[in-house]
Amino acid sequence: TLICGLCSCGLDNYDAPTASLSGAIIDKETKENVPGQAQNGTKIRMYEFYNDEWSVQPNDSWVSQDGTFSNTAVFTGKYKILAEGPFETVEPIEMEVSGSKQMNFEVTPFLRISAEATSNETGKVTVKTSVDNVLDKTIQAVEFYYCKTPYVDKNTFTAKESVELGTETELDIATYSHTFENLKSGKTFYFRVGALAVNPGGFYNYSKVIE
């Protein structure tokens, strides 16, 4: 006698995430976005409140180099939201997220970096920068970059020049300059300055990208 046993199993069906969270990391003093690093830089961490406890594994998203963020894969619910990056630690925010939610984090960056680029000779561009040591931290590195694409930071560049630091790092505001040479005429290049103040996460602060 042949007995055939048939067993059926059902797959749990979960609805896809339909909510989103977007916003910006904003300098508390200047009210401008805090420039960042697109990958392995500032991150937004979302811990969901589920079954009467906070999740252990966060829903992470990177902050763009212009200081904005957008996570479009969020389940509707209650979250504890943190921002980690090159700024003084900020308190987490608890909120309900549903639909298209917007929020900003106001922070005090370790360093404020401004930069400008000028070209007086063919094939040469001089980048000047001012580094404001907002929190009086030890500055470990100041770097000039240029890249052939708009995405430029300490990990993504065509060329990099590191500053030889001296006692000027003890100043509240220090200025530096570097001239990039042998740049092809008629091509578009993108310039940026990054600097590292001592911090546990090894996060860099940046200037805006200059085209």
What positions do the PLM features span?
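Short, acidic Ser/Thr/Gly-rich low-complexity loop/linker segments typical of extracellular
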Residues: 49-66
